[in-house]
Amino acid sequence: MSSNHIEPADESTPDDLYTSDYEVGQDNLQGLGLDIHNPVFLISSVTIALFVLVTLLMPEQAAEHFSALRFYLTKELDWFFMYSMNGFLIFCVALALSPLGRIRIGGQTAVAEYHLLSWVSMLFAAGIGIGIMFYGVLEPMNHAMTPPLGLTDLDAQASRDLAMAATIYHWAFHPWAVYVVVGLSLSFFCYNKGLPLLIRSALYPLFGERIWGWPGHIVDILEIFATLFGLATSLGYGAE
């Protein structure tokens, strides 16, 4: 198989690119006008279809189990979520202040396709558009009435302060740090290193050619689950 890569947007030398024996689409299944990845599409689509089917056939039991799972995750892994978000933010600040922060996505001569205002508008619309419309008012009110962290003995002013602090934590710098890490991982390894625009490409420095096998398949399958159910939540808020 020939080496495969996506040409970057600037005059990067071949030494700057990752070359691979993998060819995009070599594992795909074609027919009936479709071009789907095997096994990522098959496993993810069948799993999602079964998940939706079980939810439709047993809505009450599904709601009970999902609620129990959500309660367990938020109660037992709250420390992990908090430290992870802080870690993402610290990482982004350190990255911006380091020499790596001067790397231009697409190469040194790359030019942005859209103006800054257009980029900012797309970031807000695609990133937190529906969520902030729904939760921008609901979340601080909900936290004020039922304070987080189990602090139920607060006075009114303390409850309001904590409610705003929790809301700012959820909608200010911390979530954007997560978006930045994912976005930079995709764009850097695609447009600067010539790899396919896949989450698994960001793991190439760690796993090398193994990302084209099951380690990479698992990463992409989990990515599909996270994207689908995340979008379903946002669309559900919009429908309400």
Q: What are the residue ranges of the model-derived segments?
A:
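N-terminal alpha-helical transmembrane segments of multi-pass membrane transport
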Residues: 2-158
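Helix-loop-helix module between adjacent transmembrane segments
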Residues: 32-35, 39-42, 46-56, 89-92, ...
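Membrane-interface alpha-helices at helix entry/exit sites of multi-pass transporters
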Residues: 79, 154-162, 211-221
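Flexible, active-site-adjacent loop/turn segments at secondary-structure boundaries
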Residues: 101-103, 135, 139, 162, ...
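Membrane-interface helix-loop-helix junctions at boundaries between adjacent transmembrane segments
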Residues: 141-173, 187, 207
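Catalytic cores of enzyme domains
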Residues: 240
